[in-house]
Amino acid sequence: MSVQHNFDLTAFNTLALKSQCSDYVALTDHNDIEPAIRYAKAHGLNVFVLSGGSNLLLPEKFQALTIHMLMQGKEILSENDDEVVIKVQAGEIWHDFVCECCAKGYHGLENLALIPGRVGAAPVQNIGAYGVEAGEFIETVWAYDLKQEQHIQLTAEQCHFGYRDSIFKQQAGRYIIYALSFKLLKHAQLRLNYADVAQRVGEDATAEKLLQTIISIRQQKLPQPEQFPNAGSFFKNPVITAQQFSDLAEHYPNAPHYQQHNGMQKVAAGWLIDQAGWKGRRLGDVGMFERQALVLVNYGQASLQDVQRTYEQIQTDIYQKFAIRLEPEPVLLNQFGEISPHISAY
């Protein structure tokens, strides 16, 4: 285990925010987690776990031990004629894992193709797209519990998965995820909930065709971080009450929405942002992408403060126009490497 000091993280966050941590270590073996924790304690440092850097807002400098989870490997734990359970290490690239599973006839994750990041980050936000969430297929999560100071296994039920939510987000900073298992299907049950996806896939739908369709849609709508640094979808789709939606629909009858199990309505945040005039609009080096209003882009040398100023203005404008609160998705880090709550713009 080799610790590096004053390590530049600019290339390790997809928004390309200039950032430097006091201490950094890249781990390829989960057995090195405990030595890394001992190092942090001995030096009075908090621990910040870095995965793919795709859902992060980093400060220019922070005092913490950044543990970069780069473990690799996959193995089949069990299988039968209908299902397969695959254990995958946290450092594997998410999109590569999804594509490999589909190619081998292990299905369920196709709608989540091309989401940036590594596998270990999938349970934290319970990543989701086009009607599918990772938590639906996660069976077990292996992690180190910093509170109990021991390795643990959590079932999907214990993970408390919700919309862009989990126990790992609720108790941020407590768990270091190093592996997880997915229960996937050998007979594809395609999710074609979204009209755009269903139309493109067509009647002769297959898992491979669905996978390629999702990839094509995301490539057309979303900027690649290498060209336009971004953190993916920046705001959660707000879930509002039936009365709130009724008020919205009275003025905007074509507002995109999705019925929830509890009678609530999920409204498309990108549509709200577009209607408020923010699609393609910029404040200095920060703006919302011209082809997808939900994606915030660093067009130059933006700082964390520039990003915060922009998204807080968007929150204010949306609330004033629709009386709906938008919540940012990315994790915000403070100067001590701790996950910090976003300051409300309302």
Q: Each predicted region: which residue ranges?
A:
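Phosphate/pyrophosphate- and phosphate-bearing ligand-binding catalytic cores of soluble enzymes
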Residues: 4-5, 10-14, 56, 151-305, ...
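Anion-binding (especially nucleotide phosphate/pyrophosphate-binding) glycine-rich loop
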Residues: 2-141, 145-147
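Beta-rich strand-turn-strand
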Residues: 106, 304-307
